[in-house]
Amino acid sequence: MESNTNVPMRNTSLCYLEKDGAYLMLHRIKKAHDLNQDKWIGVGGKFERFESPEDCVLREVREETGVTLTQYRGIVTFILDDLTEYMHLFTATAWTGTMIEGDACSEGVLEWVPKEQVNGLPIWEGDKIFLKLLDEERPFFSLKLTYAGDVLQEAVLDGKKM
């Protein structure tokens, strides 16, 4: 088996805030050259030096939404053409602070979307898998998603191909 020691890796966090049967979704339309351009995702971002998953998600959610929260749910591994990304996935149903409204977020436009409508938005195919796992209230899971460009090639849940 070929070693992947030269493949870049990064750690990220992603959080889905839940309220009244809806997720707070971020429509990524503000940054040029964004891997998530025009897609709808939860809020989060890349780890800064010496951050834990919780540190990262707390900081990113506070920066993008103005609120403070935490609740760890699982880890998702993305294998992209020349990058491996470990995304630490969170959900939250309670927070403190004042929520940033609409397009005041520098990353895109924040909008509450009913859960049953999220899969109809332009989202990554793999996101549909882990959003289903979140809805099933799985306490912890390991999901590996392999992409070629924007196309999902393989999904492995808890070590088993889906």
Question: What are these regions, as identified by a protein language model?
Answer:
Residues 2-25, 46:
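Conserved N-terminal beta-strand and adjoining loop/helix that marks the start
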Residues 3, 74-80:
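Short, solvent-exposed loop/turn elements at beta->coil junctions and helix N-caps
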Residues 21-22, 31-32, 48, 92-98, ...:
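Short, charged/polar surface micro-motifs in flexible loops or helix N-caps
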Residues 23-59, 63, 77, 155-162:
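Conserved Nudix-box catalytic region and its N-terminal flanking loop in Nudix hydrolases
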Residues 66-75:
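A short coil-to-beta-strand element that immediately follows conserved catalytic motifs
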Residues 78-100, 111-112, 127-128, 132-139:
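Active-site-adjacent beta-strand/loop module that shapes the phosphate/pyrophosphate-binding cleft
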Residues 100-133, 151-161:
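NUDIX/MutT-family hydrolases
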Residues 134-154:
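Short, active-site-adjacent segments that bind or coordinate small-molecule cofactors and metal centers
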